[in-house]
């Protein structure tokens, strides 16, 4: 076995260890334990993983490794998503950057799809490489791509089944239309942004000479205007859409327009006659109480149009230019150029009454940033009412549990306000809709054209063409929990463990896709398999930068996990952040900000430091500000663990132990009791998905209890003359270290494996990897009767801390020996001083420990208080008296502050009445301790 390196260098072993794990098959499902399945939200094949991916994947991997160590049959299902719209955008942009003149249209459908497959192979390799570098312990032989044959067959089967059940239909309806992508997008892909715009008031002339009495009043109800009008005034933020108006609407109870219910309007600029209709939708108090109705270009107007059977006039082409349904002079104009012409002509005709600034919500596509058009087109839809009702029942009955539980409210809101789902997209990349049309436009749905012809008796003389649209990405993603397990093919289901691994145990994902993906998986899995997709849904916050800003390519604040793991120069980081921008003009600003934040680039931290940082930041219910400084701190933590292991190995050279140690010292009993408690705490934190508390618990045990205290407290025994105590301490040192490595392994797999390989043989532990060792359990060590040891060592720690604080404040050199006088104290204090005299002398560099007799005057000394015991370090030859007076005054002020805090709590009736009795009693005990300390400090101050 190779000797442990003198310094911690993760780059020297992380990649080597991962290759060993994978080649040995340690990540494959195995064992006879209960199944534990985790679904990876498949990352889009649109580039590389970002910190959000690394965040969630680290937590998933910790869960998988933890359960693998507990003997579960673990399956972590990984793969990638084809990401229709996003991928087409990326590949189209790359074609433009290549400068060969190739575009989506010049290549044609087959040629373009071939380019996408080429790019997918490249991107998919990058994603898997990143995941491996992070330490992902998934079975890569089961990795699935949503466009692979098996999941593609599942998509077709799902579509056909829902179509045959009447849940999928084709219809003409308004959809969100992106005129740049030239496809429909979902409501959740639209961002409503408040922007400055205008509100234009326009006269709509009444037809056939109809008039009405128009009256206006001031705020006090006094009449200010009365006149006969032959027009209505309508306000709009989109005057170009008036070319598609098919009605004007007033409230049925609005007395101002009671005589106009059967009237007609001569629509300006077109000459068309449109009716005045009445509908409760109108807000009489807003504006003039008259509303234009454009059913083909407004979602609310569309519903009005359906109620009143109004014609739907589509004004736009797929690129949002004016089509042939408008007067000839507008045809071919961009929508904004058409707006200018409409306003100009209205003004010339004297029909433009007023133009005023107006704040409005503008719908923009989340990918292109373009204004989205409500657009009338033929699309495929899924009826959602029945599916959503069942999906809500499954969550509210507890069959699917959200963690934290408050996310159920978000889920419920979406499910109770659900609309039919538009599943078709006007793209080439994706699962093509399994529907064929004959020349008469009749539609046939089936698994393939041959089945369609056979089912419907269509001979070769009947020409069929397949629908050119593809299904939106989330349609295939909703099948992920069971399509990856072979559904619907019986043989594949048996081979991939469908019956064993569904439902999965937990889904770890962000709140931003609860409806996009989580809800749809619940509905689809229940519909097609009769089961829930997963038992738990652990919702994480979003990763943000150190300033709380969302990480995005356009902001230039994205961090690549590999750059944190392996490091990157400032020049390479700038190049990475400024290349391939959708808005190239942002490059200069991004470069400036990057050079300011990372003047020397990013140092290599290793995968374990990044993983531990992520766990420590994973609080419930909040977004996470990622601070690179934390990663630096946890790199130091890994280094501390490395050095503690080197200490243990050096002090156990040639030793061989087995089994559980039989402790000979209080120090050993204390650390074994702490280990037992920490094992129980760790399991509870895993059960509750409290990775932050898990990291805190393990950090404090490793750094404080083991490295800082046990290693120091063990040195007197290790170097002492009592052989039994020395051997026992060596055994305990190795035993606790090995258990600590197992406790840490799910969070920091690489460093723990490298160290465990050195430690395990000295304990007679067999096995070639820590990842398949048992996770520590409460009761591995019988710690009954160790409570006294815990109390003793806590007392010893308090003594050492108090004296070290005095030495530090007095600036006593570490090597200088001092004398310690003890005053007062209980019988327990006297017994403990006698029992731990050698440790106290060793740890505190004491030349002597003496007790002051009752009534004996203490020399001028620096004082510290531990419980009832006063610790005195004579000042002669150590410090100047003025400095000690200042120190005591400062310490008195600190203790007085603590007393004030205790009194504040105990003086609060709410705290005393509502807090657990043990907590109140603990606070009273703290007050008593602080008061005792204050008395001693004041007495010492008086002596000076």
Curated annotation (Swiss-Prot):
Location of the protein in the cell: Cytoplasm
PROSITE patterns per record: AA_TRNA_LIGASE_I
Motif ('KMSKS' region): 550-554
Catalytic reactions of this protein: tRNA(Val) + L-valine + ATP = L-valyl-tRNA(Val) + AMP + diphosphate
GO CC term, one of those recorded: cytosol
Residue span of motif 'HIGH' region: 43-53
Gene Ontology MF annotations: aminoacyl-tRNA deacylase activity; ATP binding; valine-tRNA ligase activity
Gene Ontology biological process terms, A to Z: valyl-tRNA aminoacylation
Coiled coil: 878-944
Domain notes: ValRS has two distinct active sites: one for aminoacylation and one for editing. The misactivated threonine is translocated from the active site to the editing site. The C-terminal coiled-coil domain is crucial for aminoacylation activity.
Role of this protein: Catalyzes the attachment of valine to tRNA(Val). As ValRS can inadvertently accommodate and process structurally similar amino acids such as threonine, to avoid such errors, it has a 'posttransfer' editing activity that hydrolyzes mischarged Thr-tRNA(Val) in a tRNA-dependent manner.
Family (UniProt): Belongs to the class-I aminoacyl-tRNA synthetase family. ValS type 1 subfamily.
Protein name: Valine--tRNA ligase
Organism: Xanthomonas campestris pv. campestris (strain B100)
